[in-house]
Amino acid sequence: GSIRSPLVQEKSEIMPAVLPAGHPPVLRPRVGVLLVNLGTPDAPTPAAVRRYLKQFLSDPRVVEIPRLVWWPILNGIILNTRPKKSAHAYQQVWTEHGSPLAAITRAQAEALQERLGDAATVRWAMRYGNPALGAEVQALKDAGCERILVAPLYPQYSGATTASSLDALGAQLAAMRWQ
């Protein structure tokens, strides 16, 4: 037999009969699913890698060094030396679909959307880089989603991955004043 997800519902399926007699049918609230991955530069170029590294390495969950000490190291040394070297490495794995991490995450979101159908709106986001977490949360809200299920795609919990993503999500929701 097939496994039925609790998210999967027919378009005509309504909320349980807790409504008064004669009340018109009420569709279930729209659910959004957000797959979150770490991130990738927008392109395998030194400028794009620099933007990505600045965002990634500025996260206090990733680098737990006092800001006063870390800022000159990041901006004076790392962001002036690593982007060119890292861009070369990204060029070696970049495909016609972009970064492998972005292409795979996009494919996972598309497959999940196909599986869930109209029962949910599935989007994908990167903690660092694009598509940006905040933009995708806004897209889910704009699509009428009243609930968002967030699925970090990291293989295990870590403060630098899962916690950082959930921190960013919480900050985005607070900025939107969405509860």
What are these regions, as identified by a protein language model?
Residues 2-14:
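Short, Lys/Arg-enriched N-terminal segments with co-localized hydrophobic residues
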